[in-house]
Amino acid sequence: MDRLVIGTRRYSSWSLRGWLAVRCAGLDVPDEVIALRGGGQTSEIHAISPNGMVPYLVHQGARIWESLAICEYCAEIAPILWPADRVARAVARSVASEMHAGFRALRIAMPMNLGRTKRPLLETGDDVLADIARIDRIWCETRERFGATGPYLFGADFCIADIMFAPVVSRFTSYGVTLSPIAEAYRQTVLDHPLMREWARLAALEPTSWHLERYEALN
């Protein structure tokens, strides 16, 4: 059965990436949401997904796991998900891959939590600040170099590079991170995207029994 398996919308940053790609590509697949228990202990996901993680997409005979692989699959169906220009596309792939593989300090210190609103951490380590500075620089450089035709990193179209950074937009919002003017304008633009608003709306409908103390109590 075709489906997109995702975790708790409130917390699952990788699920958000896969979901955005699937929706942007116009794939007609239902969401199957599994409440996360944290720490890789969600047995229902292990029973379904080949790598025991979300997102996991089943579509017309294809079975795809890992967010970036799902994004690439969606781009084969909807090529607009990558910039048309060769140079811009190369840079978009580079920053998307950097986001997929890097920024570990930020991920650990500021896990995605859509229920947290502009509440900074009591302490922010130098490694986290370095990650924030690098992301700010990526956003500014791509906007200045490729963003003349629209509000996103590579212009008018919301592409995979934007999708990969979408959970970071949520993190920066939740933890009240201060950004440069260009990066701040981009953060607000992505936050206002209709699909981001829809994800937030659906997250707000999840039962409170799905909330995890390890994220809710983070200071």
Spans of model-derived segments:
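GST-like domain detector, emphasizing the conserved glutathione-binding G-site
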Residues: 1-125, 129
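A short, structure-level motif marking secondary-structure boundaries and short turns
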Residues: 2-5, 56, 154, 171-172, ...
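Conserved beta-strand edge residues that scaffold enzyme active sites
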Residues: 35-38, 186, 204
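Short Asp/Glu-rich motifs
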Residues: 41-42, 191, 209-210
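GST-like fold's C-terminal all-alpha helical module
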Residues: 103-192
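Acidic/histidine-enriched, glycine/proline-rich intrinsically disordered or flexible terminal extensions
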Residues: 203-219
